[in-house]
Amino acid sequence: SNPSSANVIAASPWANGFYGSPGVSGMLPAAYTLLGRRFLSSVQKAGLENQITLKEWRKGTVNTPDGWTYHAKGIWVTLKDEAGPSVSLIGSSNYTKRSYSLDLEANALIVTRDVGLMRRLKEEEEWLQEYATKVDQGTFEKTERRVGFHVRIAMWIVTLVGGAL
C-alpha cells in the first residue's frame, strides 16, 4: 500500500479568467471542466481515488465584486512529521510547445529545512485549500457543468493540431 496522497487544485469555471468571455476563449472554462472529468476517470481507472483528490478553487465569481480568479501553480511536498512543505516548485509551469517556443517560462525548486519557511509554505497551501472544494464525477454531471458539443469538437481539433498551438 502507498501511504502517499495528493490534492490537485484547479480553477472552478467561476474562477477561470475566461469565464463569461466572448468568443472562443469563453469555451475554456468548459474545456477545463471536461479535462477535470477525464482526469478523475483516469484516477479511478488506476484505482487511486483514495490517494488523489481533485479540488476546484473558487472565491466568488470572476468579474463580479469580490470575485477572484485562480492562477496559482505549484507543488508543495510535505514529508511525514514535518511542520510544512520542505520541497516546493513554484513558477509559471506551462508545459506546452507554445510555452516553450513563444513564452518565457521560469520555475524555482525550493528545498528547505528552515522551519519558519516550511510554516509559511504551509500557510500558503492552507490558504489555497480554504477555497478549494473536492469534486467528483457527480459534480460534473450537474446541469451547470455540462460541456457542450461545440467545446468537445474544439478540443478534438486542438488535439489534432496539437503542438501548433
Stretch-by-stretch model annotation:
Residues S1-L165:
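PLD/PLD-like phosphodiesterase catalytic module centered on the HKD motif
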